[in-house]
């Protein structure tokens, strides 16, 4: 509500969304407004904790934490004032995306610093000095990948294919994934750039980077890139497809969620599968706008002939020595037939008869429409059933097909390159996990794990290893973050409960818990806000909120 010239104006916020409904990931670690030493420290620790919690156990090591901490100390002060703090927020979103993709610390650190380099706030020499030659090499390669499409006309499919193949065969796959995460962020922030640049960027994404994401196995990322570029390049076509899909999307997604839960329970309760399968992973998906457009336009299908709008993948963790997994997949199909209406004409057994590229999976379809003439009609749901081993092989095999790498020999060679690069990435920076207790006692290991965030951050700040954070160490940190000695003194007074002029691990742990509580409260606030927004929007659609606003406005004006 605002007042203009004595007149009360009741603001009715717009509810229409224009951007594609792309997949939403967990939010990036929060920023805290710059200012006092306490806020700067809270910002650094909050971001550090958020990223390390996202990293997989196989890459979360002491050397990884040290590298990530250095990257944050370098990037936070450099980006905090850039574009009103938006550059820093975007850098952390990219870092969170990379952590969610289970990239190692070198990739995540390079992702943080790349944004600072693109903003002109950090030089390559500084990045290499702080992060080492490995991360610096990733930064250089990611810049090469970024510039590769600008050297050719990507509208020409042959030229675009050559660029894709050159990138896959010539660069570290981690540098490719780094650039993909940065491209996704850029696609979400194109509104402020000229229209011609929006189109050029979107075309590069559609022809080069989205297929690359498929080729390296990052299917969810590729789907977002496709939908965003489709929306920018073909807005009218996008609107048509969006109108068709969105009309049934909410209902279909609810059905998917229910089916997933019901199927997991049924599979876990099956006697035969209990003996042959150690676990189940069920994933559901609703067809993306771009993928639907390709089926309708490129393949010439009618809407009723698009049979995979709803999709589910069932991955079986097949027990060793229990056969080749084919029988377990067949049994899973039998369980599904007992739950839903099977469509036999849509069954394709690529396990018994693998595709030419070796792809193995059992494809079936089920009719999810409600029974009876008055029942709700829904599209068929395609279900893919495979073992974990079949899925691991399919990730790269199908990815290469989706990436438009048509030459089988070239595809095999590039597949080998990607697998080898992934192995290198998995081994990079790997050392013994720093648990703080190497006795091997389970209880001690569990306690160390639960206190991991506090312990590792404290060790990084306690540079001389004496078990306390001195005034000198705290001042050095504040200076690294762009603050000064007065901020360090203020922070010491705030945290030093026993007034001995240093911070013990217990005093530091108390501060960490305050930081974590603040983040949890803010997350819960966001969750409640979204729930209320959805509920009030439904009420708004009935006109009740408009009546309330008018009555409120009348009272305010008359008063």
From Swiss-Prot:
It catalyses: GTP + ATP = guanosine 3'-diphosphate 5'-triphosphate + AMP. The keyword GTP-binding applies. GO terms for biological process: guanosine tetraphosphate metabolic process. GO terms for cellular component: chloroplast. InterPro entries: EF-hand-dom_pair, EF_Hand_1_Ca_BS, EF_hand_dom, HD_domain, NT_sf, RelA_SpoT. Pfam families: EF-hand_7, HD_4, RelA_SpoT. Keywords: ATP-binding, Calcium, Chloroplast, GTP-binding, Kinase, Metal-binding, Nucleotide-binding, Plastid, Repeat, Stress response, Transferase, Transit peptide. GO terms for molecular function: ATP binding; calcium ion binding; GTP binding; GTP diphosphokinase activity; kinase activity. Residues 1-37 form a transit peptide. The keyword Repeat applies. Activated by calcium. This is GTP diphosphokinase CRSH2, chloroplastic. The lineage of its organism: Eukaryota, Viridiplantae, Streptophyta, Embryophyta, Tracheophyta.
């Amino acid at each position: 509500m605002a007042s203009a010239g004595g007149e009360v104006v009741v603001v009715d916020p717009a509810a229409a969304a224009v951007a594609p409904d792309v997949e939403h990931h967990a939010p990036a670690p929060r920023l805290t407004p710059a200012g006092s030493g306490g806020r700067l420290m809270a910002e650094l620790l909050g971001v550090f904790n958020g990223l390390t919690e996202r990293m997989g156990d196989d890459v979360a090591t002491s050397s990884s934490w040290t590298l990530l901490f250095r990257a944050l100390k370098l990037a936070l002060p450099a980006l905090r004032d850039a574009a009103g703090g938006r550059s820093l927020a975007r850098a952390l979103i990219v870092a969170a995306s990379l952590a969610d993709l289970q990239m190692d610390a070198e990739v995540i650190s390079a992702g943080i610093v790349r944004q600072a380099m693109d903003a002109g706030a950090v030089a390559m020499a500084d990045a290499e000095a702080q992060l080492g030659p490995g991360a610096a090499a990733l930064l250089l390669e990611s810049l090469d990948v970024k510039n590769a499409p600008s050297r050719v006309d990507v509208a020409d499919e042959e030229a675009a294919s050559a660029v894709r193949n050159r990138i896959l065969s010539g660069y570290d796959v981690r540098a490719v994934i780094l650039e993909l995460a940065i491209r996704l962020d850029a696609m979400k922030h194109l509104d402020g750039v000229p229209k011609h640049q929006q189109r050029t960027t979107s075309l590069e994404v559609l022809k080069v980077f989205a297929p690359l994401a498929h080729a390296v196995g990052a299917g969810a990322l590729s789907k977002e890139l496709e939908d965003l570029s489709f929306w920018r390049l073909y807005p009218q076509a996008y609107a048509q497809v969006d109108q068709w899909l969105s009309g049934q999307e909410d209902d279909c997604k609810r059905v998917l969620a229910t089916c997933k839960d019901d199927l997991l329970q049924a599979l876990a309760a099956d006697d035969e599968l209990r003996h042959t399968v150690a676990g189940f992973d069920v994933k559901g998906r609703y067809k993306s706008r771009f993928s639907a457009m390709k089926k309708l336009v490129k393949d010439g299908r009618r809407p009723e002939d698009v049979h995979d709008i709803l999709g589910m993948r069932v991955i079986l963790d097949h027990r060793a020595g229990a056969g080749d997994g084919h029988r377990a997949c067949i049994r899973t199909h039998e369980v599904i037939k007992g739950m839903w209406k099977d469509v036999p004409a849509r069954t394709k057994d690529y396990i018994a008869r693998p595709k030419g590229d070796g792809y193995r999976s059992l494809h079936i379809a089920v009719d999810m429409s409600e029974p009876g003439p008055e029942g709700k009609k829904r599209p068929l749901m395609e279900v893919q059933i495979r073992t974990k081993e079949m899925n691991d092989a399919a990730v790269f095999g199908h990815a290469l097909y989706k990436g438009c790498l048509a030459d089988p020999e070239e595809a095999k060679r590039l597949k080998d390159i990607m697998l080898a690069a992934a192995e290198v990435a998995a081994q990079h920076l790997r050392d013994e996990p720093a648990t703080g207790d190497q006795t091997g006692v389970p209880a001690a290991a569990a306690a160390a794990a639960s206190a991991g965030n506090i312990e590792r951050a404290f060790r990084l700040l306690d540079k001389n290893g004496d078990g306390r954070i001195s005034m000198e160490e705290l001042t050095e940190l504040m200076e690294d973050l762009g603050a000064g000695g007065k901020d360090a003194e203020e922070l010491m007074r705030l945290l030093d409960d026993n007034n001995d002029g240093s911070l013990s691990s217990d005093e530091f742990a108390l501060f960490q818990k305050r930081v974590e509580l603040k983040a949890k409260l803010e997350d819960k606030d966001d969750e409640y806000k979204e729930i209320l927004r959805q509920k009030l929007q439904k009420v708004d659609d009935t006109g009740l909120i408009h009546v309330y606003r008018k009555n409120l406005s009348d009272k305010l004006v008359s008063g």
